[in-house]
C-alpha cells in the first residue's frame, strides 16, 4: 500500500469523516490545509433536485459574486460602433468584430469570457466549433449575449460564477480562493444559492437544494449543512 504524503496526512487529520460542516467550519478547514504550489480555488458543488435529461429541467446561469473570485478575468467582446467603445471603457481586454473572429480562427484565445452584442452573433455563430468546446460561446441565458456589453464586461471583471447542471444533477462553480475569509465566502455562496432558487424549474418536485459541498482545488470535499446557508 502506498504511503501517504505529508499533505495527505494533514488532510486526513483535519477532516472528520461523515461530518456535516457549517460554512464557516468548512472554510476554516480548507484554509488551514498545507498550501499547494499555486493559488487554489474554493469551489462549490450543489446537488439539485432536477432531472437534467428533461430539457425543461436544465439549470444554467451566471451569478455575479459580491466578494469576487480573486481571479483576473480577461474579456473579449464582439461589438462595433458605440457598443465597442462602451466595452473598451468598461475594461474589455479585446474588442472587435470580423477582425476578432479572424484572430480567434487563427488560434488566439487569450481570454476567459466572450461577450457579444446581439448583432454580432452572425459572426460569432461561425466560431461555435472553436468557442463551444472551451465553454466560451456567448449565450443570452448567462448574460453574455446582450446589448449592454459594458454592463456584461463589468460583471465578468468583478467576478462571476457560471454554471450548468451536469448529467448527475449537480452544478459546479468557483466561489473564491483559498485565503478568502468565511464572511466573503458566505456572501458569495448565499448569493449563488439565491440565484439557483430563482432558476428552479417549475416541473422540479421535492427537495431542490439537496446537498452542498465545498472544496479546494487540491483539497477534500466537505459537506456543508444546507440549512446553514440562508438566501
From Swiss-Prot:
SUPFAM superfamilies: Ribosomal protein L1 (SSF56808)
GO molecular function annotations of the record: rRNA binding; structural constituent of ribosome; tRNA binding
One Pfam family, short name: Ribosomal_L1
UniProt entry keywords in alphabetical sequence: Repressor, Ribonucleoprotein, Ribosomal protein, RNA-binding, rRNA-binding, Translation regulation, tRNA-binding
Source taxon at top rank: Bacteria
PANTHER family registered for this protein in UniProt: 54S RIBOSOMAL PROTEIN L1, MITOCHONDRIAL, LARGE RIBOSOMAL SUBUNIT PROTEIN UL1M
Function text: Binds directly to 23S rRNA. The L1 stalk is quite mobile in the ribosome, and is involved in E site tRNA release.
Complex formation: Part of the 50S ribosomal subunit.
Protein known as: Large ribosomal subunit protein uL1
Organism, scientific name: Acinetobacter baumannii (strain SDF)
